[in-house]
Amino acid sequence: MREVKAVKINAADFAPYGTFCSMTEPEGYPLEGEIHKFYPDRISGTCVGTMAFSPIEVRKDERIVKMAEYHTTTWEGIVALDDDMLIHVAPASGGTPVPELAKAFLVPKGCMVKINAAIWHLCPLPANNEVLHAMIVLPECTYANDCTVVEFEEKDWFLSLIHISEPTRHAQIS
């Protein structure tokens, strides 16, 4: 079985798939008040209709990726709430799965990723905890009207490894 080693998420390597931002350690210039610092518009995205914020619980398993999904008309946000999370992504491919092109990223707790429309992905996986709690941000009912899930043939399954390899390029979070 093919192994995909996770890379710590970084702007250069993740750019083809989306964007990300630490929500607990944001960078950049804040708008400040007496008791607050506000970091506006760190991630943005368009939406037709109502946005929905949905909790997800994911149990730790063998990290064998057997399927993926994509959304043709919308991006997806995922926020790691109580653990670092492992996500896998593959490039948009016109509806034909490309598991051989999958990449894995380790996303720190408190970070939000925005996965672009048409990018292959599935639920985040817990890095350390037995159960990961995360928040999914999608237009309302996307799971029912714009979610294509494809099960891979067994020969295309891959193992997501938590052993972190170094980023292929070095870049700062933007």
What are these model-derived regions, one by one?
Residues 1-47:
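N-terminal leader/capping segments at the start of a protein or of a new domain
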Residues 119-147:
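A short beta-strand-loop micro-motif that forms or neighbors metal/cofactor-
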Residues 107-122:
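Conserved metal-binding segment of the jelly-roll/cupin
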Residues 38-67:
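A short glycine-rich, His/Asp/Glu-containing loop-to-beta-strand
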Residues 72-93:
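Glycine- and acidic-residue-biased ligand/ion/polar-headgroup-sensing regions
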Residues 92, 97-100:
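Betabetaalpha-Me/HNH-type nuclease active-site subdomain
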Residues 100-106:
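Conserved interaction-surface patches within small, structured recognition/assembly domains
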Residues 162-174:
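Single conserved hydrophobic/aromatic residue that forms the stacking wall/gate
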